[in-house]
């Protein structure tokens, strides 16, 4: 009920997608309670939103989103929109922060047909993450000798992964054109972090970014990203091949097969967008590596 739980003799299955969401919601009852909440001056630009106030928004945002999703499931898009709007009206993004808690609302906006609002929220969150990433990225580039990477590594990982996740959610929805500029921004400002991640780990998580670049007409950038990812996989394949004679050859063969699967996935992506000669050349090189491993 609102912000509290009531113990009732009803068994509710655990939500496998989010096991932290306990119990069930009676949306109309909760709606009546939520509409009676007194927010004070929460949306005012003239007050200081102290850390505890902002921290309390975690529960409010989470529960309001749950309520909105229940209305969406019931097909009541009008009330779902009302709750979503209430959330951002009373807890403006700029004042309450904890940006990751607002990310699920993008999907909710899409579900109720509010495309423009969904994409506006995406852009607002993107700016928050990208501002942080730019600070660390430019600091590393301009003050390489004195920038204390170890002191900020956790923040770098956090904002990079949040930004990447934000982009991947749009890719899963098929919004390739819309998100293409964001992909270019991501690569431009985070590529310097590959020294922190390790080049292989940095690039391998960008496989899903290749196709949107091609589809949006950024063929040169798409090929460049393909090459960077492919070179990391090929290097890993060569390393595994050189170690095949070790006693743990079965394990190495399994690792090799996994990397080959990743390489073939890359080829399937570019096949639809690259000229035949380029694709054939890449395919032959991969087949040669595979044959050398088998015959060794």
What are these regions (language model features)?
Residues 1-296:
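ER/secretory pathway lumenal C-terminal domains and tails of membrane proteins involved
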């Amino acid at each position: 009920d609102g912000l509290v739980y009531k113990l009732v003799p009803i068994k509710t299955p655990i939500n496998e997608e989010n096991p932290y969401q306990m119990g069930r919601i009676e949306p109309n009852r909760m709606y009546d309670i939520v509409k009676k909440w007194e927010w004070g001056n929460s949306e005012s630009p003239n007050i200081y939103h102290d850390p505890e106030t902002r921290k309390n928004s975690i529960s409010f945002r989470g529960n309001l989103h749950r309520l909105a999703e229940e209305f969406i499931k019931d097909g009541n898009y009008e009330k779902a929109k009302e709750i979503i709007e209430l959330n951002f009206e009373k807890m403006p993004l700029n004042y309450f922060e904890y940006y990751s808690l607002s990310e699920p609302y993008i999907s909710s906006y899409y579900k109720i047909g509010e495309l423009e609002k969904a994409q506006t929220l995406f852009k607002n969150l993107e700016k928050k993450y990208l501002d942080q990433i730019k600070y660390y990225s430019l600091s590393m580039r301009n003050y390489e000798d004195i920038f204390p990477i170890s002191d900020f590594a956790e923040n770098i990982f956090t904002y990079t992964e949040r930004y990447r996740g934000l982009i991947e959610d749009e890719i899963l929805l098929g919004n390739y054109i819309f998100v293409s500029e964001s992909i270019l921004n991501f690569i431009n400002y985070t590529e310097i972090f590959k020294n922190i991640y390790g080049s292989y780990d940095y690039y391998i998580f960008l496989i899903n970014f290749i196709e949107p670049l091609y589809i949006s007409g950024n063929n040169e950038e798409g090929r460049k990203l393909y090459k960077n990812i492919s070179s990391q996989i090929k290097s890993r394949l060569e390393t595994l091949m050189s170690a095949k004679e070790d006693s743990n050859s079965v394990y190495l063969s399994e690792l090799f097969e996994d990397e080959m699967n990743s390489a073939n996935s890359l080829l399937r992506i570019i096949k639809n967008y690259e000229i035949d000669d380029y694709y054939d050349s890449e395919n032959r090189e991969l087949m040669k590596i595979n044959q050398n491993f088998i015959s060794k």
